[in-house]
Amino acid sequence: TICNTGYDGADYSDRAFTKRMFNVTAGDPDMIVIFGGTNDSWANAPVGELKFNGWTSSDMYSCLPSCCFMLEYFTAVAKDSQIVFLINSELKDEITEGITAACRHYGVQCLLLKDIDKIWGHPSIKGMAQISDQLTEFIK
């Protein structure tokens, strides 16, 4: 999950994107690809509201404020990296729309994936190939 809320309301603060994001910029990447929101949607994590500053620890338990926190970090720390946010198909509308709005606010490229083959809401092997094809076409 992007946020600290996982399946069945479990605390995922030890493995959420907001915890792991600090490891991504260690190697000065040319491109950062974020594929987030799938588990937040399927786990019924709280969606929350877009929040562009003043985050609290309780905000990190909702998807959209956590997404904004993460995008703020990446755009501030990885200024020379191309950042692309992949949004899975078939997510809750409020998550898709919120992440899209957050990307627009932070100037992050956003790819809305289409017709991805899935198993239990996650891309199958065929779906991963479809994602690769869509991302390759997007960054050309």
Range-by-range predicted roles:
Residues 43-62:
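A solvent-exposed, charged loop/short amphipathic helix patch at secondary-structure junctions
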Residues 108-116:
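His/Asp/Glu-enriched short active-site or ligand-binding loop at hydrolase and phosphoryl-transfer sites
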Residues 7-13, 87-95, 118-122:
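Acidic-and-aromatic substrate-binding clefts and catalytic sites of carbohydrate-active enzymes
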Residues 119-140:
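Histidine-centered active-site loop/cap adjacent to the catalytic His
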